[in-house]
């Protein structure tokens, strides 16, 4: 029996014979992106993704990442050492296995004087930032997710519409969080889903949701993807722009930025102030997902 479909539009009867997968984390909201055509790049080339997948409705929050860290510490998959949050990466064709910084402590998630993780409740629902690519992958691996590929991210942001931003072609401070956008949290992140068409005290927001139901795909936090700049590059691609981005044009759905994830000499890891992420789960063998 389908206990609780993550997509509010999920037709449980339709998927009765499908396998139900428990994501093991209760508060990651996912929306379904069906296989099909979408518009890609500056020229709006029509491209195909021939499989269905789930993608995060929101960027991963400080609370979600904190919950991951505390659970992973207990399982010895995250280590707190010398005021650092460290994860292990299994390695790939380009990066050797080893220990890497998962995230530097900040005012949202920090390590206290007793070497215990702490969370700022005031920032619990803001996107986690300052996360390394390795930290984002560690979160995904822990819960059975992955980072989205650029194509998956862009389709979820734009659909089959030749538009510059997830909601259309124009941008102003009521649509997204960027540098000097004068939101109530300036000069920092806003809570995920903040731009939903409602007044927040005296600050008016437009509903900046994508056609698939994703929020904050422009501004707030840069989002790590699973794609390298090229096969031998230490740079991975980011999408969407961040709260400290001076040029909103770089928040357009087809824009790709690159971030170095490791150095050739110690320290081998690299984090960036405004880098966060959202998750993806590719659907295989007619799976659907539920959460508690």
Task: Name the predicted role of every residue range.
Residues 3-4:
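C-terminal motif of bacterial Sec signal peptides marking the signal peptidase cleavage site
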Residues 12-25:
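N-terminal low-complexity, Pro/Thr/Ser-rich intrinsically disordered segments
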Residues 18-20, 43-44, 257-269:
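Short, P/G- and charge-enriched loop/turn segments at secondary-structure junctions
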Residues 22-98, 130-134, 219:
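A short glycine-rich, aromatic-capped structural motif
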Residues 32, 54-56, 137, 146, ...:
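Residues within well-ordered beta-strands of beta-sheet-rich folds
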Residues 78-117, 174, 182:
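Core domains of carbohydrate- and sulfate-ester-processing enzymes
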Residues 112-260, 271-273:
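Functional-site microenvironments in short loops/helix caps that host divalent-cation chemistry
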Residues 273-289:
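Short, structured beta-strand segments at or near domain termini in extracellular proteins/domains
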């Amino acid at each position: 029996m389908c206990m609780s479909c993550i997509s509010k539009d999920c037709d449980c009867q339709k998927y009765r014979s499908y396998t139900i997968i428990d994501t093991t984390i209760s508060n990651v909201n996912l929306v379904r992106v069906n296989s099909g055509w979408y518009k890609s790049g500056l020229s709006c080339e029509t491209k195909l993704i021939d499989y269905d997948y789930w993608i995060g409705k929101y960027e991963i929050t400080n609370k979600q990442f904190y919950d991951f860290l505390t659970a992973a510490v207990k399982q010895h998959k995250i280590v707190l050492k010398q005021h650092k949050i460290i994860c292990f990466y299994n390695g790939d064709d380009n990066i050797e296995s080893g220990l890497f910084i998962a995230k530097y402590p900040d005012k949202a998630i920090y390590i206290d004087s007793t070497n215990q993780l702490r969370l700022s409740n005031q920032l619990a629902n803001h996107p986690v930032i300052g996360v390394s690519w390795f930290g984002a992958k560690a979160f995904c691996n822990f819960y059975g997710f992955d980072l989205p590929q650029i194509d998956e991210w862009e389709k979820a942001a734009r659909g089959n519409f030749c538009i510059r931003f997830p909601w259309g072609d124009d941008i102003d401070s009521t649509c997204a969080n960027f540098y000097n956008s004068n939101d109530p949290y300036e000069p920092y992140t806003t809570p995920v889903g903040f731009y939903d068409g409602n007044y927040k005290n005296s600050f008016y927001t437009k509903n900046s949701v994508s056609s698939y139901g994703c929020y904050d795909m422009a501004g707030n936090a840069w989002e790590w993807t699973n794609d390298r700049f090229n096969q031998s590059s230490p740079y991975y691609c980011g999408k969407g722009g961040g709260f400290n981005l001076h040029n909103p044009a770089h928040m357009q759905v087809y824009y790709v930025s690159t971030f170095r994830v490791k150095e050739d000499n110690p320290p081998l890891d690299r984090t960036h102030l405004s880098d966060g992420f959202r998750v993806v789960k590719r659907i295989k063998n007619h799976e659907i997902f539920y959460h508690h």
